[in-house]
Amino acid sequence: MSYPIGAQPQGVQGYVTSNSSQWNSDVFDCCEDMGICLCGTFVPCILACKVSQDFGECCCLPCLFGSVLAVRTGIRERYHIEGSICNDWVCLSFCGQCTLCQMARELKARN
């Protein structure tokens, strides 16, 4: 025996709030902090280790392939910065040292 539907369920109205933000500096604003700029230019491996450590991960993490991409994505997620993994990959692939400097400046500004 089936019963006819007497009333349709009512939809719930909700509002989605976006707490997204932007990077504090652009990828090519390398000269904003000359210390980070020089470190990123001449010893980017050391800067990558420092960024990883400042993010709360092991300083040896950048020795693993793809880990800097994971850290950049983690920074974006932690601070609700707009972007995508694809954008992160493109930045790191074509402007790796500048992107690393941006990550270091972001962590310095937010910590």
Curated annotation (Swiss-Prot):
Pfam families reported in the protein's UniProt record: PLAC8
InterPro entries found in the cross-reference section: PLAC_motif_containing
Ranges in a coiled coil: none
Source superkingdom: Eukaryota
Transmembrane region(s): none
Family: Belongs to the cornifelin family.
Protein name per its UniProtKB record: Cornifelin homolog
